[in-house]
From Swiss-Prot:
Protein source organism: Methanococcus aeolicus (strain ATCC BAA-1280 / DSM 17508 / OCM 812 / Nankai-3)
GO cellular component annotations of the record: ribonucleoprotein complex; ribosome
One GO term (biological process): translation
Designated gene of the protein: rps24e
Pfam families: Ribosomal_S24e (PF01282)
MF annotations from Gene Ontology: structural constituent of ribosome
SUPFAM superfamilies: Ribosomal proteins S24e, L23 and L15e (SSF54189)
Keyword set, alphabetical order: Ribonucleoprotein, Ribosomal protein
InterPro entries: Nucleotide-bd_a/b_plait_sf, Ribosomal_eS24, Ribosomal_eS24_CS, Ribosomal_uL23/eL15/eS24_sf
Entry's family note: Belongs to the eukaryotic ribosomal protein eS24 family.
Protein name: Small ribosomal subunit protein eS24
Length: 102
């Protein structure tokens, strides 16, 4: 999977960094967790403060557009993000931990 950053801007009012990207891949669409790990590695970000907001793909296309938010601190992340989004991203982290432990 190859990821190209199309926009990377700081949002000091919301204490976060907003990143838009294009992901090119072969085969199946990458999971939220795969995208999150690749983006955090590329941008040297903390994965616990990274939220994958959206991944949009057209049917039959091997390219996806995505939007990721990287928060400065956990307090800001909990203040601005919906509980469902936080839970989805935490579930993805838990799955990674279980896979690494096996």
């Amino acid at each position: 999977m190859e990821i190209k950053i199309t926009s990377d801007r700081a949002n000091p009012l919301l204490h976060r960094r907003e990143v838009k990207f294009i992901a090119n891949y072969d085969g199946t669409t990458p999971s939220v967790n795969e995208i999150k790990m690749k983006i955090t590695a590329m941008l040297n970000a903390d994965k616990s403060l990274t939220i994958v907001d959206s991944i949009c793909q057209e049917y039959g296309n091997t390219e996806s557009l995505g939007y990721v938010k990287i928060y400065d601190d956990e307090k800001s992340m909990n203040l601005f993000e919906k509980k469902s989004v936080l839970e989805k991203n935490k579930i993805e982290e838990a799955e990674t931990t279980e896979e690494d432990g096996e």
